[in-house]
């Protein structure tokens, strides 16, 4: 199996096929495009849970992991409450570096108004860089919990922000010394500044307040992977207009430089939303300072189409994230 997400066929055959449901209080089950689980806490309330793993540099790992977990959590329509963290550190890892990671985690939790509720930290010979797993918990009214299972044909797909947000940031940060030979420092800084857009909490709250059917965030594999997963979870087809998908100029330039596809590059920070009246939702989001556009709609059947002017092609199951060609 290649680096990145385990292929959908493997997940279905070797993971999901073996899992059985036992507890009636557990309202959701694992599946493609299912980003969170829900546990019935009372006749009215549901506790939602989501998890996300990250490995890498100490200055990135905390903020990225927190946002990935909370991003998955808020897709249910839930208000996030707190996180648990599990961290595996390589031998020789310094206490000062651990402090940096925890400080960054706490800083992101402060911004999101959530608690660090606990966790586990250990040094392991099995890893050669820090590995951080964040589990987020939240709460939502049962009547307000969102699910892709409720999507119907004809509903529109609204996308917030732009494709390739996280990938552009990582490439600009990790390859700055190489990119500086072609682009000026302001351009590279603009790409690195995309880190501040990784959270979809504001997007999701605005969408939930408006009244939408379901949401799915774009993460590993990019916008194309997210669209496929959204359609899988909904058991629907879709058609998407390529030119409606937002791209920052920094993303276009850097992807061209490295010869990678921005639509298949990690895109944390962008949210896909299923809604009846996409234009009205876009207006609602833009009034709150969130860039958004209608990029397509769901339809009956299994066809998942990408339309680029007169060219129509089929969306394929997610591939290895394009960023692994470079980092």
Feature names for model-found ranges:
Residues 274-280:
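Helix N-cap motif at beta-to-alpha junctions
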Residues 1-57, 85, 106-110, 114, ...:
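Extreme N-terminal cap/leader segments of soluble proteins
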Residues 58-83, 100-111, 199-206, 225-229:
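Small-aliphatic-rich amphipathic alpha-helix that forms the alpha element of a beta-alpha
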Residues 133-147, 182-206:
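Active-site glycine-rich loop that binds ribose-phosphate moieties when present
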Residues 2-3, 7-11, 288-327:
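Acidic, Ser/Thr/Pro-rich beta/coil linker or hinge segments at domain junctions
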Residues 90-92, 191-267:
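Active-site-proximal betaalpha loop/short-helix elements
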Residues 28-31, 218-219, 237-246, 263-266, ...:
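Beta-strand->loop->alpha-helix junctions that form or flank phosphate-binding loops
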């Amino acid at each position: 199996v290649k680096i990145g997400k385990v292929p959908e066929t493997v997940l279905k055959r070797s993971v999901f096929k073996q899992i059985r449901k036992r507890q009636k209080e557990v309202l959701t089950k694992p599946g493609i495009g299912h980003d969170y689980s829900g546990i019935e806490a009372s006749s009215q309330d549901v506790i939602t849970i989501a998890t996300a793993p990250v490995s890498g540099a100490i200055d990135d790992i905390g903020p990225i992991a927190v946002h990935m977990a909370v991003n998955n959590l808020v897709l249910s329509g839930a208000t996030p409450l707190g996180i648990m963290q599990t961290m595996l550190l390589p031998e020789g890892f310094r206490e000062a570096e651990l402090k940096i990671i925890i400080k960054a985690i706490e800083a992101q939790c402060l911004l999101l108004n959530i608690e660090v509720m606990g966790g586990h930290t250990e040094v392991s010979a099995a890893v050669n860089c820090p590995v951080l797993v964040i589990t987020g918990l939240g709460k939502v009214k049962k009547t307000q919990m969102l699910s892709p299972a409720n999507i119907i044909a004809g509903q529109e797909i609204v996308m917030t922000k732009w494709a390739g947000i996280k990938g552009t940031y990582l490439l600009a940060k990790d390859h700055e010394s190489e990119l500086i030979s072609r682009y000026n420092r302001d351009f590279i800084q603009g790409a690195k500044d995309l880190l501040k857009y990784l959270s979809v909490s504001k997007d999701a709250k605005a969408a939930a307040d408006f009244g939408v059917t379901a949401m799915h965030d774009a993460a590993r594999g990019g916008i194309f992977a997210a669209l496929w997963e959204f359609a899988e979870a909904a058991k629907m087809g879709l058609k998407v207009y390529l030119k409606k998908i937002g791209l920052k100029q920094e993303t276009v330039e850097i992807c061209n430089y490295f010869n990678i596809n921005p639509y298949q590059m990690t895109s944390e920070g962008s949210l896909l939303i299923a809604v009846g009246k996409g234009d009205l939702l876009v207006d609602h989001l833009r009034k709150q300072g969130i860039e958004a556009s209608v990029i397509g709609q769901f339809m009956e059947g299994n066809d998942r189409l990408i339309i680029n002017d007169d060219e129509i092609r089929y969306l394929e199951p997610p591939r290895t994230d394009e960023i692994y060609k470079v980092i």
